[in-house]
Structures are given as structure tokens and as C-alpha cells.
Amino acid sequence: MIKNIRTTHIGSVLMALIAIVIMIMRPFNDLDDTAHIMLAGIIIALCIWIFKPFKLTYAIGGLVLALFGLLIELPPTVIFSGFTQPALWTLIPAFFFGYTLQKTGLGRRIAMAVIKICRPTYISLIFAWIPIGVALSILTPATTVRVAIMLPIAVQCCELFNLKKGSKGNSLIILTAFAMALIPGSGWLTGVIWGPFIQGQMAGAGIMVTFGDWIGVLLVPVAIATTLLVIGGLLVLKPDEMLSPQAIEAIKKQHPAKMSKDEITSAIILVAVFVASLTGGLHGLSTAVICIAAMLCFFIFGVLETKDFNSAANWNLIIFIAMAFSLGPLFSATGISEWLAGIVVPALEPIAGNPWLFVFAAALFMFIWSLIDVAMFLPTISIMAPILPRIQEAYQVDPLVWIAIFILAGNAFFLAYQNMWAVMSRSIAGNRAWTNQHQGKYGLIYFIACLLALVVAVPIWINAGLFG
């Protein structure tokens, strides 16, 4: 019986008990009764998002937030403010972009085209995943879609090469495909699902984050971390098996079908989205306007049909993110933001005076915290975003610095349960999946790569005035 008790069960019970104690005892002098009730509701929502008791979904946690907000009679404009965030209307089209890549076969075509130019060496094959990940990240921020496209191809490669299951070579190929689906797109706002999410959270806190802001703070460290991870993976997980030249030739002999009209149309639209987002300073259109226009084009040109509307978007995740966007206004309306700021801001004082100490201490804490917050790091970002202006006011640390730390730490994957896309990748790979030992080593390489990337990034951020 005791063996069947999981960490998730213990965590769920503890968080539920904390919420009950807060509602009954009202222990915080700086919070009134409504704030205590709302805080309890937030803790229950976080419990659902992190531990998923009774297999409850992300959307259910969002509905718990709405319920508690209505119970204490907050205005609907506060409770449901997340649904009016432009970032949400960037995210919804993003799901359609990913669905289009899968439906038309464009994503697989791009990936296979890159694999076919490889030489029969591990170095060539491993580095091939970088342009595949970058290309797919330009076309869609949906990491789930990129994983769904790239992992089956990686598995096919391992089978064609007849690599031993659980071997270093097998794990290296699968892990690299997963990592390149996850990490490179973090360098720009529309390359990862966190982009629209963080943009919305920051907007709720009165901070505007543009496409250019995101690239300025994250492109360099992400590029460095990506490159170092691939190189480190080759060194630490150096395969014992040789690759068969005949296997590469077998892949090259797979002749793809002629590119369809839908694929061509999709490619034009998706590239146009990226270019338009990159040149926003010239034409003045917001990312939300660009993405919604592109989504409409898919339907107008017949790439998507009405029946695709329900299939394309993950409405469970959309409701969750919309309600998470509402956390900032909920915090402000109930006074929780001020209360949290009174705890967090003084706690940062010992490290805030030195940019190097601040960045590395905060990054180390967030990497450790990622072992607890396994809900894509979204709950942590939701809690921190409303108090970042207070941190900036106290210590002149620009919120953009926090965004970089959130993203780098949020991608961590030391342990099997820690990263939802790692879990998804292992599921897709089946008996071809990497071993826990190989994942641990690869995750440690990523952590070290991020620290080295920050060594380069911190001087850039200092020169950019992000530390006052």
C-alpha cells in the first residue's frame, strides 16, 4: 500500500491542507479575508497544474481560479481578463500553425530533406537536428508539434542504422532530436509556446515585451547553449557503434511525393508570419494581428477546413493559459501582489547588488525549482510576473533578465518526469527511448551549457542597460 503512494499524492495532499488552513486560520496579517480565500484558490489551482490529482486537466485548475474569484465577488473583467490578452490571440493561431505542418506533411518533408544531406557519421547526423529544429521553430511555436514530427524520424534513423536499444548511439540520436525540438526556438518570441504566454503575463504586470526585446536577451544564450549541448552530447555519449553508410543511402532513396499546393501555400504563409514578426518595427502590426491574419489565410486558401477547427487547437491548454494570464490582475485586485513583493523583494537583497551573482544565483535556484514545477514552468512565471516591476524598482533588474532565466531553466530535463516534452518524446520513441542514465547526463550537459552561455550573456545584458 505504501509503495503505491507517489510523490504527486503527497504533494497534492500537502497543498490541499495548506489551502484549507489558509481559508480557516487566515494567518497573514497583511491579507484580508477575500485575499486569504483567493490565495487558497490559487494554491489549489497550482496543485492541479503541478500534480494533476485525480487526473484533472490544466483547464480544471483554471476553472478553480474562476470559481474562487466569483465566490469573493471580484469583477468578471478581472477574473477573465486573460481572455482579452493579445498574447492569447497569438497562441491560438500558433496551434493551427502546428496542426497545418502535420496535416500537410510539410514538417516531415523539411526534416527528411535535412536528414538526406547527411554523411554516414554521428557528427553529421547529430548536427542535422539543429537546422531541423530551427526551421520548424520558425514555422510554429508549438513544441508538441515539433516533437511529434521529429521523434518518429529519429526513431526511424535508429532502426535503419540497426542501433542497439539503450545504447549510447541510440540515446544520443533520440535525445538530440528531442532537445532540438525544444531548445532553439526559445531564442525568439514566436518560436516557443512560452513566448506568447510570457508576453501576456508581462503585459498584465504593465511590462511590454516585443519580438525584438526577446531576441535581444535570449538569442545569444540560447544559440550558445544549443551548440554546447550538441557538442557536449557527442563527447559524453560518444557512441561505440559505427553507422552504416547503407542506412543513410536507404533514407536518401526514399523519394518524397511531389510538393502539394497546400504545402506550398502553408510554407509561404508561415515564412511570411516569421518575417512580419521580425519586421514589426517597420509596419507596426502586432504579433497577434499577424498570427490571426495567417490563421484566416489557412481557411481562405483551403489548407484548413471547418472540421479542423476543433482538432487544431488544444482548448484545454488555451483555457488554462487564459486563466493563468488572469493571475496578475487577481493578485493586484486582492492585494496578494503587494504581500508577495514584501516577501520576495527583501529576500533578493543579498544578491541584487552584483549582476553576476544575481544571475547565477537566480538561475541555480530556478534550475532546482524546475524539479518541482513540472507544469512547463508556467505556474512559477504566473506567480513571479506581477512582482517583477517591484523588483525592478528596488534593484534596477530589468524583467527581461528574468525571462531569460525562466526559459533556460524551464527547458531543463534532468529527470524522467521533469519535462513534459521529454515524457512525450519517450512515449513516442517507445522501446527506442533513451535510458534514465543517459537522460541524466544529457540534462546535466544542458545545465552546464546554460551556465557557460550566461557567462557570455551577462556582459551583453549589462551593456544593454538591463541592470540599471
Label each residue range with its predicted role.
Residues M1-N4, Q156-P239, A422-G468:
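Membrane-core helix-loop-helix motifs of multi-pass transport proteins
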Residues M1-T90, G216-G342, K441-G468:
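Hydrophobic transmembrane alpha-helices of multi-pass small-molecule transporters
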Residues L46-K55, I132-A142, F178-L189, A276-L282, ...:
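Transmembrane alpha-helix interface/packing and boundary motifs in multi-pass membrane proteins
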Residues A66-L71, Y122-F127, P131, A177-I183, ...:
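Small-residue-rich segments of transmembrane alpha-helices in multi-pass membrane proteins
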Residues P86-F96, T140-V145, W214-V230, P399-F413:
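Alpha-helical transmembrane segments
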Residues L106-A135, C158-K165:
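Membrane-embedded helical hairpins/re-entrant loop segments and their flanking transmembrane helices
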Residues C118-I153, I351-L408:
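Hydrophobic alpha-helical transmembrane segments of multi-pass integral membrane proteins
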Residues T144-E159, I174, W188-G204, L340-G342, ...:
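Re-entrant/interfacial helical elements at transmembrane boundaries that shape
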